[in-house]
From Swiss-Prot:
UniProt entry tagged with the keyword Kinase: no
Lineage of producing organism: Bacteria, Pseudomonadati, Pseudomonadota, Gammaproteobacteria, Moraxellales
Species name: Acinetobacter baylyi (strain ATCC 33305 / BD413 / ADP1)
Protein name per its UniProtKB record: N-succinylarginine dihydrolase
Gene3D superfamilies: Succinylarginine dihydrolase
Quaternary structure (record): Homodimer.
One record GO biological process: arginine catabolic process to glutamate
Domain of life: Bacteria
Protein family membership: Belongs to the succinylarginine dihydrolase family.
Amino acid sequence: MSGYEINFDGLVGPTHHYAGLSFGNEASTKNRNHLSNPKLAAKQGLLKMKALADMGMKQGVLAPQERPHVPSLRKLGFGGDDHAVITQAMRTSPELLSALSSASCMWTANAATVSPSADSADGRVHFTAANLNNKFHRSIEHETTSQILAAIFRDERYFAHHLALPPVALFGDEGAANHNRLGGPYDSAAVQVFVYGQQFLGGQVAPKRYPARQSLEACQAVARLHQLDSNRTVFVQQNPDVIDEGVFHNDVIAVSNQQVLFHHQKAFFNQAQALNEIREKMALLEQDLIAIEVPDQRVSVGDAVSTYLFNSQLITRPDGGMTIVVPEESRQNLAVWSYLNDMIQMGTPVDQIKVFDLRESMRNGGGPACLRLRVAVNDAEFNAINHNVLMNDALFARLNTWVDRRYRDQLSHQDLADPALLIESRSALDELTQILNLGSVYHFQQ
């Protein structure tokens, strides 16, 4: 039996705009109210997906969500027909309309936490949609996320789906952006590493400037839901000082693949102790941790955040070597680019760099790792997936044509009140569900 890691990238939605909604994410805040280009954003994402598929990787597509989200506006007291709801919202609360038009679901690293069957007691792949309760504009995503994941991973013999945790700070959950898995082959047991920002019950250590979006209590709940073995599970606190420097998720300061953990010197609280626990638990599986620690004197936390060096993808190529996928911003920074080129000569499995232009996503605060949800499967599970969502030449061509017909090449905040945008977005998503064979996953389809 062989194993695969499938990267499911979020397709950027038609209402992609710069609203500066994510306090603690400095790129998001800095670019507030700039003009966006939804068509370019979607095409940049598709190019990355296709390039990885062409490398021999298993690559999937996750559909965007319905925006503007009229049902949420109705819950907040706006009435009339759908166009009236949007017009009222723009007139009296444009910030709310912006939040409920956000295309932030493109960052599918926050969609869910996924545990492979090799790690779960019942031998199934487990999914828990993230509640994302720390940010209002993202807290509405989990219901549709669950429906889309269930439309892709339908067979209950292989896949188990859990509802999001209770939407309170005690169980604040940001999904796979705070979750790593370290081990050998993708279909073999591994050590799952949950990274949290704060322990809410009895914890003393917490950031001061920016919020800790992930709680220890949420990590523990997900581990229980996924039926994980405590001997192969590690809970690690992120360094609160780096959260206060803009490291809002762990995938902004660390990334893992198989036995490799690529991380900054300041990534974790009590870092040496955390790495020792990971190393000891991997040893029980006869696996050695390869920790690539970037010294602060080579790359500062500020440079790591601005270039998204660690918000990269580490992928294993069919030839067994590893490639690090970084945004163009990493190449433009002298210190970061120098370190990357030194790293691929260090004799670790990481021996190749791939650079992608993801500027539309980066300006809103999301790099390569933000855009993808990793799902490790065996042969039987792979065959049970809805294959209409897997990237190939035909799907790439079809989705590019779809984007060309359906997306605008410029969007401002004022455009969100345009009645035509709502019609355009719904028509686009309705067609997309047919292309990807998802069924009726959106509220407007039901």
